[in-house]
Amino acid sequence: MAGRINDEDVKAVRDAVPIDAVVSEYLQLRNAGGGNLKGLCPFHDEKSPSFQVSPSKGFFHCFGCQEGGDTITFVMKIDHLTFSEAVERLAGQAGITLRYEEGGYNPSHQRGERIRLVEAHKIAAQWYAEQLATGPEADTGRAFLADRGFDQAAAEHFGVGYSPQGWDHLTRFLRGKGFSDKELLLSGLSQEGRRGPIDRFRGRLMWPIRDIGGDVVGFGARKLYEADNGPKYLNTPDTAIYKKSQVLYGIDLAKKDIAKASRAVVVEGYTDVMACHLAGVTTAIATCGTAFGGDHIKILRRLLMDNGSARVIFTFDGDAAGQKAALRAFEDDQKFAAETYIAIAPDGMDPCDLRLAKGDDAVADLVEPRTPLFEFALRQIVARYDLDTPAGRAAALDEAAPVVARIKNSGAQHEVAVQLAGMLGILDTQFVVKRIAQLARWARDRGGKGPAPDQRQRGGGPQQQAGPMTATPRGPALNLRNPVFATERELLKLALQRPELVSPAFDAYGVDEFTAPPYAAVREAIMEAGGAEFGVQDPQDYLVRVREAAPDDTVRAMVTELAVEAIMLHRGVKGVDEVYAGAQLVTVRRRAVERRIRDITGRLTRLSGHGDPAELAAVQNELWILQQYDQNLREHGAAAL
């Protein structure tokens, strides 16, 4: 059993790896104000960014699904790692050597399964690349690449390799690196043979497939020899780290340019990705042995941000198979907020052939004059009918109308319906528009998938005022229109985000001064962590301690939410300063004092008739002291605390 990672080393990892640098490897982040960043949440499907990152605090929080935590938590959740595995990965990125307690630690045998499988793929990718670069048997592979316009430098840039024809070359090599037969079989790099594991890929050109974080998780392999009875392309089977429906070839190279340009180009094959990138179209990606689908859309959506100017361009062969691929993509188009287009070379060549025949400029030009995908799909349908006859036009409308009816936005649906009428040559445009609208209503009445028109974005990102009021599946339901709750929330945000503005006064506040139970729990967690005063001394460790002191996941999520959420400034307030913080401190304290005054007044009423004179005098004195304190707070503000 692996030893426990030293606490100081865990803290060093948190401090060394900026959370925004880690998160931006998986999604596009933009300025959210107040020093925070925002993006589309990778943990649930959304169209408006409700996921926020606070680089200064080292925390993230989603106001939609309530996921939150620090850098380590993010890596654990997004890559399905244990705590130790996530720390080990981040430590490797930061160059930190970890120390382990409770006995020795043998990395080659005791690391988590995912990390072991990723390590096996990393070593395999390096080995395959070496075989292609120097192995005499790899002449066939090098010739294949050269015939398609790729030199050694291109092969190295994309990590292309070669798997020798023998039965178990890689298997024996990885065994020598300390990997067990079980690990090799689980990784998909080896498969069961008659006498034990053998190489899955033999005599093939190898493309490493990386996840969005850059880890090699699988391979695509192209047949090179006629004697090979296997398929032309062979991919890694689904494993613990590789799901073909959830990976895109080239995403590790293209992600930054996709986010920067708000454009993604989807091609069909590995060589097409290579050709596009070498021609300057560095936003090109491809699926890996499967059709483009919903999980691929989620990956791109996080990078494109659905900001209205995003473009997704599909390039397919001009043959029937390519056209079917385009129409399949259209089935999922409703999940895209980005506008989707298709580009097909006039002569039907794919980007790889186009680059070879006409050069880099032709590839770059391919993705410029593009056709909206819905228009392409409709033209494919319409082309099958004789539009010179009324029967042909009616039949084409019958098939095309349901496609247009699936467009959820009513304005876009109307516009496309008008275009369809023009394609069909039907002069009565309103007839086509009404027919499609009727089909859309029928689909909704039958409980069809998708939201009603113009209701695609009911949930949204956190606004400074409305965001915290959003109902959450796990967090406590609070009516923040209640000014008491709202002020308590702001004071806790200050205590977590700007402790220097409220310390030491805040640490004298009792848990009972917070009337909302979850806020009282957060106040108690802050107290258990050493108070706001500790936050002044060590801001990073302070938030970690507060989260650890939380009694359950609900309170822990609330701590993260309050640490990330922007501080809400009232009208006329220019910034977060001591004056603003003092006002929140005074408001919360005065409300607590007023509640106590009401309680004592009621007690005094009960004692007035037949109470003990000494007790009555004591209660009257307490009431007078509280009234004087309340007056001082009203007249002198924070100075009276």
From Swiss-Prot:
Residues binding Mg(2+) 2: 317, 319
Any one GO BP annotation for this protein: DNA replication, synthesis of primer
Keyword match Zinc-finger: yes
Free-text remark on how the cofactor is bound: Binds 1 zinc ion per monomer.
Metal-binding in keyword set: yes
Molecular function terms, GO-annotated: DNA binding; DNA-directed RNA polymerase activity; zinc ion binding
Gene Ontology CC, one term: primosome complex
Pfam families, alphabetized: DnaB_bind, DnaG_DnaB_bind, DNAG_N, Toprim_4, Zn_ribbon_DnaG
Disulfide bonds: none
Domain of life (superkingdom): Bacteria
Positions of Mg(2+) 1 binding: 268, 317
Catalyses which reaction(s): ssDNA + n NTP = ssDNA/pppN(pN)n-1 hybrid + (n-1) diphosphate
Keyword vocabulary terms for this entry: DNA replication, DNA-binding, DNA-directed RNA polymerase, Magnesium, Metal-binding, Nucleotidyltransferase, Primosome, Transcription, Transferase, Zinc, Zinc-finger
Cofactor(s) demanded: Zn(2+); Mg(2+)
Zn finger spans (CHC2-type): 41-65
EC number: 2.7.7.101
Segments of this protein annotated with the region Disordered: 444-478
SUPFAM superfamilies: DNA primase core, Zinc beta-ribbon
InterPro entries in UniProt: DNA_primase_core_N_sf, DNA_primase_DnaB-bd, DNA_primase_DnaG, DNA_primase_DnaG_DnaB-bd_dom, DNA_primase_Znf_CHC2, DnaG_bac, DNAG_N, DnaG_primase
Entry note about domains: Contains an N-terminal zinc-binding domain, a central core domain that contains the primase activity, and a C-terminal DnaB-binding domain.
Protein purpose: RNA polymerase that catalyzes the synthesis of short RNA molecules used as primers for DNA polymerase during DNA replication.
Family: Belongs to the DnaG primase family.
Annotated protein name in UniProt: DNA primase
Organism taxonomic ancestry: Bacteria, Bacillati, Actinomycetota, Actinomycetes, Kitasatosporales
